[in-house]
Amino acid sequence: MKNIIIFGAISVAYAQVSFSGNTETRLAESSSGYYYNETLINTNLQYDAFTNWIQLEYSDPPELGRGINGVRKMRLEYDNGPVKLKLGDLYEIWGRGLVLNSVDDQPIDRDTGIRGLTLMYNNPSFSTQVIAGKTDISQSTINALGFNNRTHNYHVSHNLYGLNIQKLLGNHDFGFSFLQGLEKHPVNTFPEDTLNLKNQLHSLSYSYMHSVFDFYTEYIMNRSYEFDEDRWSSHGKGKGLYGNLNLYFNLFSLNLEYINYRYAMIDPISRFNIVDYYGYNQPYQNPPVAVHIHENVLMNRISHQTDFNNEVGYKAELIGSFSDNIEFLSIFSQSNRTHSWVMDENFMWKKDKELSFLPKFDPAAMPFKDFYTELTFRTLQNKMFIKVGYADMKDIIDLLQNTVTDTSQSLTYSITDAQTIPLNFSYSFSNGWSIESKIELQWLSKGYWWYEEKNNQIIADSLMSIFLDDNGKRLDQEKNTFISFTVSKSPKWSLTLTSDKASVKESFLENKSIVNPLEKFLGIDQERNWVNVEFVYHITSSMRFSLLYGSLKGGLLCTNGVCRIIEPFDDGFKIGLSTVF
């Protein structure tokens, strides 16, 4: 009888417990010495109203960031009707992220998670959340010692607590958020090496839902204080506005987004200096951007990096269908800083004119604009898929000089200007075989634009390109070509050959790529081509193995306006193994 009772108790307990997880192992080594070996293990244990998440990492070293051998993240959750409690590593978003949007974006090694406690209460018309904890955020900057592209060299800690409230009245949703952080901010000044800061964020939000449209807006105020001897002194204040309007029609929808961030007005040279300029936009905010995040390789490499402290912009997105088999997408986005900038008689930057609440293409305000459109076709009973697009982007990266007198102006800035055509094609055969091809063509201009005017006469208005041919002659454009071709047999395996080609070399990049036997076998120029082949095999429905050999170009990788440079990978292997259990 005793054994029966014990067996019954174990059976009931087991029936109430569920366990799941996944693992991912990645190993790579190139001929240039680039090496990483990392394994991530996620486990989820659920018992009744409790859920436990643990992430283990074993890396020596990881692809990006510092090595960890042990527990990386953990969280315990209790969910009982309207009440939810979380303890451990928290990743939360309030509204659209103007006050709080903590993320773990491993492809660019960006982790703004909070280790602490949060308590939430929800019912159909009211919700509230309190949060308290600490976040240690690592970033890369050239303004601190030890900069490199693989490991962050600047580390800041924040002790946070805050409150978020949402109230629903019919179709109207009202919100209020408050978040305060006590920051330990390392600086390069003597005798102080760390500053004590207090950052406060307040926001009000409103949204409205309707059958044919929805609307959201949020206004945020920022105040920062610096502890000086025995009291808090005001350091800075700013504000921000975000708006989103979606219109729904029978065959298409229109999405409009607007940002107006005015946390700080920092000169063009120092605007990304996170060491010496502090108390403004915080890394745990991660608000929306007025930029389309391109999924195509060549367009993502030249993505616009948003200045979250000071940027005004909008994005208009039209999406719909001409028929059941033809869909379209068109996006236009534009932004600039809130003021234009000019140099004084000592060649020091100062604010010039405040611009309109809508952006315009004034080079002295470091503008950006991007147009993208695509058509998608599905035919032959959805066996054939074709997507063709066109992108036209222009981005003034840095303002280098702008001196203005009564009779003259001298203006110099760095600019990126590109036109890109992506084409995707796939065809699925009836026996499980399929083929897929991706082709991207890009005409890229990049360099320094010089404009000179005297006595109403234009003396110079031209681009000095950074692209050179083999004889050292400057070329107006670089042509980039990205091609991939995949053959697959569902559900077991796929084989992909990828070629990434540039027509010329940038004048400031002198490193020569290492000989890749695959490129040599194909008889292509190894200085301007990166070729690799990848084999993927599904061992079981829950286990996937991948093997890549060859070279990867690297370059800029951006997510939500935050960018990081990924180093090239020359003549090497990458091995991956992922499982789900």
Indicate where each model-derived feature is located.
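Outer-membrane beta-barrel proteins
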Residues: 59-68, 152-154, 222-236
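Transmembrane beta-strand segments of Gram-negative outer membrane beta-barrel proteins
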Residues: 15-37, 45, 50-54, 83-85, ...
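Short alpha-helical segments and helix-capping/turn motifs at coil-helix boundaries
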Residues: 38, 69-74, 112-116, 159-163, ...
